Amino acid sequence: MARNVYGLDLGTYDIKIFDKKKDRIWHAKNVIAMKDKKYIFSVGDDAYEMYEKAPGNIQIIFPMKNGVIARFDDMQYLLGDLLKEERSFIRGAEYVIAVPTDVTEVEKKAFYDLVLHSEAKAKSVRIVERGLADGLGLGIDVPEEPGAFIANLGGGTTELSVLSYGGIVMNRLLKIGGEQLD
């Protein structure tokens, strides 16, 4: 039986999950609707439908800010709910998380802990720098590529990376993304 490996990209506005076994990408909005500041009312795409339309007693919360986890408990609830919803996720699978390169070790550990202690009951969790993950996702032979420039324009950040022979030569995480350009 082939092992189950999932790649996660937790962005400011979107969550992307790659299922290696099924060779498919699953998308969901990275948002929570909270009622009266204490009850989770809705998550994911359903919560996003309420964005800028919700009444005053419903708050729309984005658990990520500038590419990192800003509200750990909310992010953990959201990820757990999404994994329960998507029945194809197998407990005991391996997870690879793409994280921005220019973040602190504490911020990277938050991504690691988020998945390790989630509903996924992960067998293993690995962190990979987003620039390398982007290169692989684009079909670039990263270990053999003499040079590639990659720009990842996200909702809250833009990450610029120069890759060469399997490594990142230069990387910048800019705290400007689609929300500022809209």
Task: Pin down the residues of each PLM region.
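A structural feature that tracks compact, well-ordered secondary-structure segments
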Residues: 159-161
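Nucleotide/phosphate-binding catalytic cleft detector across ATP-hydrolyzing
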Residues: 1-28, 33-41, 45-151, 163-182
